[in-house]
Structures are given as structure tokens and as C-alpha cells.
Amino acid sequence: MADGEICRCQVTDPPLIRHEDYDCTARMVQKRIEIGPLGVLLNLNMLFHMSRVRHTDVYPCLNNIMSVSVSLDVPVSSGVGVGRARVLIFTTSRERVGIFHGWQVVPGCFLNAPCYSGVDVLSDELCEANIINTSVSSVAMFNRSYKPEDVWILLLTSSTCYGYHDVVVDIEQCTLPSNIDGCVHCSGVCYFNDNHCFCGRRDSNPSNPPCFQFIKDCNELYGTNETKQFICDLVGDANLDSVNTLTKEGWRRFCDVLWNTTYGDVESRTFARFLWFVFYHD
């Protein structure tokens, strides 16, 4: 679990750590995505929490953003030699997008069918790639800040391409989050072991993972055999107490183990990360 979170104190208080000493850019690398001719929809908040940055960076949360830079490697069919990639960045309501996933296929949205209905387009760029240089990039500067969970990236390619390799997203974090509890003693990075400040989280304690804060009051979430089987398939029976699998303590232990153990694969921690940020908003 990350040890710190960004916190901003009142301007009259001397900061313990100045955030200017750190790079405020969060770089996220999405592993290779196989998409065929359809599109892939990325939500910045979900993508961030599924990346290794979320586990190792000094910033365990992604703040409001002012710009997005997307770079991707677009393999081009050798018989044609030229391909196109479309990078569409937009905002829309959660109701329109539906259930969140790190990525999902968007049927019906092809290179020349923008699917703009009900969305606010922030940037729409068509990039060309060729057989020699398959790397393309798109930069979007916003005229206001947006919450990362409200920003989506739709990646599309022409039929002369056969998917994506690594997708790299750079985010400019324009603001530090205001602290709802005052947090008068610290600035910059606030660590859980700093008893002066908990950065607005009253339960910011490594022994009490935030995902458990929601789960402990939600019987529907942990009280089903389907969920039990999913967890056992994901982390193995040996990683959970057989007696406590469907208890609140079992869930707390599951979140803690899945979050803190390095399995060597980003996807191994996807479910815990999903619980962590969806059910416990900053």
C-alpha cells in the first residue's frame, strides 16, 4: 500500500514537505491491448489505479487534470505501409458510459464514426503511422480542470492497423486536493505515520485498508458464493483463511494481501484496486 497522499494545508502554515520538490506528472503505461478493428475506451481514473504508478509513486491518488498526452505504438500492416489512429478525449456522464472497466470494446465506433452523442469532446486528433515509424502521439490541453474519473480516452485505428502495443498516458495534475479536515500541520506529501495529519481521511491507517471501509458495511458485496469463488480463483485458497473468507475480517485481509503482495502482474491486483478507488472516494 502506498504510504502517503497529497495534502495541502492552509497558506499560513509552514509546510513540512513542499510538493514542488516532486514531479507532479503521473505517467501511466497500459500493457499491450489487443483490439482488432474496434475501439478501446479508457477511463483515466481506472487506468491510473490499475498501473504500477499507483502502487509505487509518491502520489497514491490522481488529482484534477489540465492536460493529457497519449502516446501509442500502432502496428501497421506490411502490405499497406500506412495506417491511421484516432485519439478521442471526452467527458460524459457515468450513466452513459455504463459500468467502468479499465478498457472495454466500444461496438459501432469506428474510425470515421465519432459517436459524439451525449459527450463533451475535449480533443479529437487523427494521427498517421507508417511501417517504419509506428509511434504516434496526441496532446490535449484543457481550458479547465477535470476530475480523472470524468475523462475518457477512446482509441481507434484504421483497418490497415492490427491493434496497439503499449499505450502511454501522461497527466498534468493541476491542483492539490483541498483537505476537508483542515490539515493545518502539513503540506505536500502526508504520510500515514504522521500523527499530525491524516489528510482528510480519519481512518488513514495501513492496518485498515480503505477498500474495507466500504466492504464492512455492505453485506451484499461479500456475502455470496460467487464472490467467494472469484476470490479463490484470483488469489488461491492459501491466501485466505478458509474460516474467514466471507467475513468482514476475511475481506479486510483479502484487500490487504492483494494490495500489498507483489505478484509480478498488474492484473493480479485489479479487483482490489477497483474496490479501493470506486468504493472509497477521496
UniProtKB/Swiss-Prot annotation:
UniProt name for this protein: RNA-4 uncharacterized 31.9 kDa protein
Cross-referenced InterPro entries: BNYVV_p31
Domain of life: Viruses
Organism, as annotated: Beet necrotic yellow vein mosaic virus (isolate Yugoslavia/G1) (BNYVV)
